[in-house]
């Protein structure tokens, strides 16, 4: 059964899921988990190590396992990985389980933020070299075009590139509280 107070944050890498998530959870009086952090804790390996040693399909299965373990939760904000929704099983689970919130940023903002992150696979070329901002922008644009249809399935949208963090949290809190009230009346 769909639980409107089980909140899933989606968006591209560096869109703000891990930053906004705990602040939003606190504002709502909810708990918070970050799927990537949960996987790292369970596996005792970094995301990059998991991808390198066991591959993406294994990682996507881990994501689904974490989602399944929280399926009965309420009053919880979950930061998804940037590519979680690419997994059909995860996407369908999330749509049926709770409320999807899309944290959207433009390509230039995402590329700029990514250029400051050393630990992201998107930052590296085929031989492990750091990419130029132009190459990062190209990658972001291609991946975003692929992921956008799933991101756009969200019930709530927040633009995170030009809005101050505090304003984003306030706006999202109001939108989510309205969404929960509206959906509690219909259930």
UniProtKB/Swiss-Prot annotation:
ATP binds at residues 14-19, 120. Its EC number is 2.7.1.71. Keywords: Amino-acid biosynthesis, Aromatic amino acid biosynthesis, ATP-binding, Cytoplasm, Kinase, Magnesium, Metal-binding, Nucleotide-binding, Transferase. Its main location: cytoplasm. GO terms for biological process: amino acid biosynthetic process; aromatic amino acid family biosynthetic process; chorismate biosynthetic process. It catalyses: shikimate + ATP = 3-phosphoshikimate + ADP + H(+). One of its GO terms (molecular function) is magnesium ion binding. It comes from the Bacteria. Its cofactor is Mg(2+). The keyword Transferase applies. It is found in: Cytoplasm. Catalyzes the specific phosphorylation of the 3-hydroxyl group of shikimic acid using ATP as a cosubstrate. Monomer. This is Shikimate kinase. The gene is aroK.
């Amino acid at each position: 059964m769909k639980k409107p107070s089980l909140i899933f944050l989606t968006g591209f890498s560096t869109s703000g899921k891990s930053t906004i998530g705990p602040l939003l959870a606190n504002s709502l009086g909810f708990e918070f988990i970050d799927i990537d952090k949960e996987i790292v804790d369970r596996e005792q390996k970094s995301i990059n190590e998991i991808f390198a040693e066991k591959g993406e399909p294994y990682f996507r299965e881990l994501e689904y396992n974490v989602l399944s373990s929280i399926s009965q939760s309420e009053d919880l904000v979950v930061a998804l990985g940037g590519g979680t929704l690419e997994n059909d099983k995860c996407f369908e689970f999330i749509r049926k389980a709770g409320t999807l919130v899309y944290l959207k940023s433009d390509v230039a903002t995402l590329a700029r933020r990514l250029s400051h992150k050393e630990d992201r696979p998107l930052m590296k070329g085929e031989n492990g070299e750091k990419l130029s901002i132009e190459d990062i922008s190209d990658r972001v644009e291609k991946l975003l075009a692929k992921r956008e249809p799933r991101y756009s399935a969200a019930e709530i949208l927040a633009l995170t590139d030009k809005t101050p963090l505090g304003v984003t949290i306030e706006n999202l809190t109001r939108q989510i509280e309205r969404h929960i009230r509206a959906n509690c009346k219909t259930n």
